[in-house]
Amino acid sequence: MAFPQTFDAYLPSNFQEFLALAKFKPEYISLEALHAVPLDPAHTASFEYAKKITPHEGFIHSVRCYYFSLAILANGFPSGTAGVPQITFTELVRRVYHTCILHDLGWTTTAEGRAHPAHTMSFELHGGIMAYEHLKAPELELDAHQLGDIVQSIMLHTSQWNEGTVSSTKQLISLSALLDVLGLQAFGPGVLGSMIHPKTIREIEKEYPRGKLGADARQALESNAKEAPDCLIGHFPGGLEAFVKVIRDEPIVPADE
């Protein structure tokens, strides 16, 4: 498996325009190959922090999101588009790892998380602020551009627009998180299926089982909506109620498929 050396750093927010730039072909990539992608030294600190703060099923969901993101990157994610700034594979992976592993800190039920002054905000903002406070530690060696992209992507990962520009980091966390929570139909029939091979999904789900993610996601989102009726995910078409109804309980790809 060979990844492109660079990718488009920014993408159209409009989903159809994004798809037009991509060259997706869902080739099978083994989880073993994805595990072999090098990570920056700071990833361990984010892994341990997310494991401590995020509820277990949400944490395992975050791990799956990272590997889904890598598979999508390998299968035709926009790269080398004329006039678009490029980001190296190594740099993008660094940002995507921290974003994915930390993106649901706002689901926390820990005393530390619930005592945080941001706990009454929409969970994406609450989690983004906690991620910022964690990532700005000097020993993690993230500059302002890296930190800004990671935190902004966490804060906006449930938001979609038809105009403007998003970073590739934000696009990947949105794609992978909605794939894991809603399944292959999240962006319409055949869309996510064009980006990632079902066997790759199956291997990731087998290694990192979804457990009761569906129930935990519903509980986290409904609890957040009671505390913050203006929560960001409430802007999903049809509102929070419509989103909650389509959350998956079953594996995305059944083990026998």
Give short role names for the model-derived ranges.
Residues 54, 116-120, 227:
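Alpha-helix N-cap/helix-initiation motif
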Residues 44-66, 106-113:
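Active-site flanking loop/helix segments enriched in acidic
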Residues 62, 66-69, 73, 127, ...:
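Buried hydrophobic packing segments
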Residues 1-30, 55-56, 70-90, 159-257:
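Divalent metal-dependent phosphate-bond-processing catalytic cores, especially two-metal-ion Mg2+/Mn2+ enzymes
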Residues 92-199:
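Divalent metal-dependent catalytic cores for phosphoryl transfer on phosphate-bearing substrates
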